A protein has these predicted regions:
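Short secondary-structure boundary/hinge segments and terminal tails
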Residues: 11-13, 105, 191-192
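Residue-level detector of short coil/turn "hinge" positions at structural boundaries
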Residues: 1-2, 180
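Active-/binding-site microenvironments in catalytic and ligand-binding cores
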Residues: 3, 8-9, 153, 175
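Acidic/Gly/His-enriched mid-domain segments of enzyme catalytic cores or analogous surface patches
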Residues: 4-94, 101
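Phosphate/ribose-phosphate-bearing ligand recognition and processing surfaces
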Residues: 101-115
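Noncatalytic linker/hinge segments flanking ATPase motor cores
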Residues: 93-100, 134-140
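Long, charged alpha-helical interface segments
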Residues: 34-71, 112-200
Length: 200
């Protein structure tokens, strides 16, 4: 189970962890690290089954906690096909929201190439009419698909991660449709659900 947490409210993970409402949950570090649980995809590849993790961020977590009673799934390039299928079964109207990046220094928002492409990958697997915004995301994904890794490594946030030694994070996040996991927000935490809608 992954509990999204509003990152801008956390300045001391030790203090926040001691008062967290999720008994037994471990806090993932806000600073990207491959050696401990963090926002780095590499750090989560060996996470034990059944572990509870609190993941703080200023983009995806904030959006997740703002959806209220609306059924909410977490999608990306890795699980685009599975999430699209599950969303399509859940309702006729689907909103796909690229999270972007929230800057810690001034709280400003930066739209991200990789989030637009990820949204397009999910849209590519949906049927039905599309908004103009969805059409643009779909076109962007189709244009990028044949050179996905190269473009992800060369986009703004990709270059920043490469410079910091996290090129593997980019490549890992850029793997298309390699996961059937569908994370659904249930009682404040993302749990894996089957495409029939039942938690696993």
């Amino acid at each position: 189970v992954v509990f999204p947490y509003r990152g801008q409210e956390v300045t001391d993970f030790g203090r926040a962890g001691s008062s967290a409402p999720w008994t037994g949950a471990e806090f993932a570090g806000f600073q990207r690290s491959a050696s401990r649980y963090s926002l780095s995809p590499q750090s989560l590849t060996t996470i034990p089954e059944g572990m509870q993790l609190v993941l703080a961020s200023r983009n995806g977590s904030v959006l997740s906690l703002a959806t209220g009673a609306t059924p909410t799934l977490a999608g990306c390039l890795r699980n685009a096909r599975a999430v699209a299928f599950s969303a399509q079964r859940s309702g006729r109207r689907i909103a796909i929201i690229p999270a972007g990046e929230r800057w810690r220094s001034d709280n400003s928002l930066r739209p991200c190439f990789e989030d637009l492409i990820g949204a397009g990958a999910i849209i590519n697997r949906l049927t039905g009419s599309l908004s103009p915004e969805a059409q643009v995301a779909l076109v962007a994904f189709k244009a990028a698909r044949s050179q996905l890794n190269d473009l992800l490594l060369r986009c703004g946030s990709g270059k920043e991660l490469v410079e910091k030694g996290f090129a593997q994070d980019v490549l890992l996040a850029g793997e298309l449709n390699v996961s059937d996991c569908v994370p659904k927000l249930i009682h404040g935490g993302y749990m894996a659900v089957s495409n029939a809608g039942h938690s696993e």
